[in-house]
Amino acid sequence: MQISHKNFRNIGLIGRPDKSSVVETISLIHDHLISIGLHPVFDSETAELVPYKNTQTVSRALLGEVVDLVIVVGGDGSLLHAARALVKFNTPVIGVNRGRLGFLTDIKPTEVIFKLDQVLKGQFQLDRRFLFEMEVRSKGDLIYSAIALNDVVLHGKTVHMIDFDLSIDGQHVYRQHSDGLIVSTPTGSTAYALSGGGPILHPSMDAIALVPMHPHTLSSRPIVVGGQSEIKIAVHENRVMPMVSADGQQSVSLGVGDTLHIRKHPYKLNLLHPPGYDFYMACRTKLGWNQGFESLQQQD
């Protein structure tokens, strides 16, 4: 897919609502866009945070339909939330980090104008990330659906372990007794799945990681399968029935015999990075891979 900077005229702005530093950065970007002749558009939630009453405002659900590029100011969670609303429009997204790790929101606030100008001039890397579509079915009927950029997680309501069957592409894999299962995209492999002992998948990989959560059998290890795989989880009778969540959002309770279906979403997120983006450098910085060695390298 080709994305041309010449089409960047209407620029959507989304900000994390609970940080004053976000308002400062959003205001800086807003004023800069106007100064270079572009048209900023707030999503309705962000518009409530800023003092610009004459700037166009659109609901987040429709923002991707009216803008050519969306700038998200916040943490990775803010970009996850925005991605789920924007992906069906194929609208490119760029992130400014006002959160913690910032694997997805990789522009520093101190560099925002310089880096943003590079992107607006066509100097960017296109990073296409796939999402999951998830369905919960009861007796064959669809009772809940959601999309996820990071992961779909089956988990218990309490500390009790749960029993479930896992199938991949119609083939039975195992029945497991554990705290749950994390089904992760490459994007999500540096999030919750990583803390569960899962592998780090490069964002370009067409793969899915399945990471057991504290399995009762120590031989139950993470599995990596092809990105086109269809995952099915069947719930058995449990002392406390499990729940499922997509990207850590609303959790839905599952009953005996309910099935969870996970597959690749038909659309991809078009994530833009400024020049010089390096996934491995992000891992070194965010995950502290070089801790203890940087001072030694400087001494050498």
What are these regions (language model features)?
Residues 1-69, 110-125, 136-146, 275:
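ATP/NTP phosphate-donor binding region
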Residues 13, 72, 183:
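Redox-cofactor binding/interface segments in oxidoreductases and associated redox assembly factors
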Residues 16, 71, 75, 97, ...:
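A residue-level signal for conserved active-site and pocket-lining positions in enzyme catalytic cores
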Residues 22, 77-83, 189-195:
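Short glycine/serine/threonine-rich phosphate/pyrophosphate-binding segments
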Residues 86-96, 103:
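Gly/Ser-rich helix-loop-strand patches that form or flank binding pockets
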Residues 100-179:
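Catalytic core of DAGKc-family lipid kinases
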Residues 154-155, 169-172, 219-300:
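ATP/nucleoside-binding phosphotransfer catalytic cores, i.e., glycine-rich phosphate-binding loops
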Residues 174-219:
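Gly/Ser/Thr-rich active-site loops/lids in small-molecule metabolic enzymes
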